[in-house]
Every structure is written in structure tokens, then in C-alpha cells.
């Protein structure tokens, strides 16, 4: 399926100079959303995944249906102050600013094979931070899946040594 026809291009959002790739049209089309989810599920099945991890918020949109289809758990990575129990944290930079990500300390058991999911790979800051959280808890990053990669931002360089699936590139 050509997923690009289901991704809206929004110039100057959230800041001037940013060209945002909006996946909500893909989510609004049940067949496209299912096809994207199925592609990631097939990728994950080849990697013997124990747990799916996704950063807030669009990583949830991708990761939850994948974890459901695989019959494995989902662990959210959230911004500081959004998780109610003891967390570990990491500071990170992203395409349009800086932030802190967290995950519950008990979210991942040592040795669990983890699939990280997110909507978009831009500079790689969010995923690099998510990888650090997973690995600090003893998880093994068995795969990383994105709907979209912005190749001109060169975020892939942050993922050397990791197995990556991208459904569409810009």
C-alpha cells in the first residue's frame, strides 16, 4: 500500500520552518491503518518480541495495536510528570526543542526483547532517548518501527546497529 497518500503535509507546524507529517488521515482510513499495523506486526513476528514500547503520544497510536496483535504487553514512554509510579528519566533533543522522557522502573524485565514503535523518525532524538531507557532497564532492542522517516534530517545515524523498519520515506 502507498501510505504516503494517507499522510498530510502541514507546513510551518508546530513552528515556522517545520514541515509536519500528519498521520491522522492514515488513522482515519481503517484499511490503511490496518495495513500499516499489519506490516509492523509481520516485521515484529520475525524478531520474537516480548514487549512493545512507544514514546508519547503517537508511539502509542502505532504500538498499542501492534502489541494487541502480537499478544504482548505495551509500555509507554512519557514526558516527565505523566507516569504515577517510580520512573527512570533521560534528557533528549528533538526536531523542535528539548524535553525529558520517562518510563516506569518495572516496565521492562532484563532480557526482554523489545520493539520500539513511533510514527516518525526525524532527528532521532526521541528514539535515541527511548533506546537508552529500554537498555537501562535491561531490555534488548530487537527492532524499531516507524511509519515515516524524514531522511533529510539524518536521524538514522542515531540507530546504527539497530534493526529498523520504515514504511515511508520523505
Swiss-Prot record:
UniProt key word Glycosyltransferase: yes
Localisation per UniProt entry: Cytoplasm
Gene Ontology process terms (BP): adenine salvage; AMP salvage; purine ribonucleoside salvage
Keywords, comma-separated and alphabetical: Cytoplasm, Glycosyltransferase, Purine salvage, Transferase
Reaction equation(s) it catalyzes: AMP + diphosphate = 5-phospho-alpha-D-ribose 1-diphosphate + adenine
InterPro entries: Ade_phspho_trans (IPR005764), PRibTrfase_dom (IPR000836), PRTase-like (IPR029057), UPRTase/APRTase (IPR050054)
Single GO MF descriptor: AMP binding
Pathway stated in the Swiss-Prot or TrEMBL entry: Purine metabolism; AMP biosynthesis via salvage pathway; AMP from adenine: step 1/1
Organism superkingdom: Bacteria
EC number from the UniProt entry: 2.4.2.7
GO cellular component, one term: cytoplasm
UniProt xrefs under CDD domains: PRTases_typeI
The protein's role, per its UniProt record: Catalyzes a salvage reaction resulting in the formation of AMP, that is energically less costly than de novo synthesis.
Family stated for the protein in its record: Belongs to the purine/pyrimidine phosphoribosyltransferase family.
Assembly, per entry: Homodimer.
Name recorded for this polypeptide: Adenine phosphoribosyltransferase
Record gene name: apt
Amino acid at each position: 500500500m502507498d501510505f504516503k497518500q494517507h499522510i498530510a503535509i502541514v507546513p510551518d507546524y508546530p513552528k515556522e520552518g517545520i514541515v509536519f507529517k500528519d498521520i491522522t488521515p492514515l488513522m482515519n482510513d481503517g484499511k490503511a491503518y490496518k495495513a500499516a499495523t499489519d506490516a509492523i506486526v509481520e516485521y515484529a513476528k520475525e524478531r520474537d518480541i516480548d514487549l512493545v514500547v512507544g514514546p508519547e503520544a503517537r508511539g502509542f497510536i502505532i504500538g498499542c495495536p501492534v502489541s494487541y496483535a502480537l499478544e504482548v504487553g505495551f509500555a509507554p514512554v512519557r514526558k516527565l510528570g505523566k507516569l504515577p509510579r517510580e520512573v527512570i528519566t533521560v534528557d533528549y533533543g528533538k526536531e523542535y526543542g528539548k524535553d525529558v522522557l520517562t518510563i516506569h522502573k518495572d516496565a521492562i524485565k532484563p532480557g526482554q526483547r523489545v520493539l520500539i514503535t513511533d510514527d516518525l523518525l526525524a532527528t532521532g532524538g526521541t528514539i535515541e532517548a527511548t533506546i537508552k531507557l529500554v537498555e537501562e532497564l535491561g531490555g534488548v532492542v530487537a527492532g524499531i518501527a516507524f511509519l515515516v522517516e524524514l531522511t533529510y534530517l539524518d536521524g538514522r545515524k542515531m540507530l546504527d546497529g539497530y534493526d529498523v523498519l520504515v514504511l515511508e520515506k520523505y
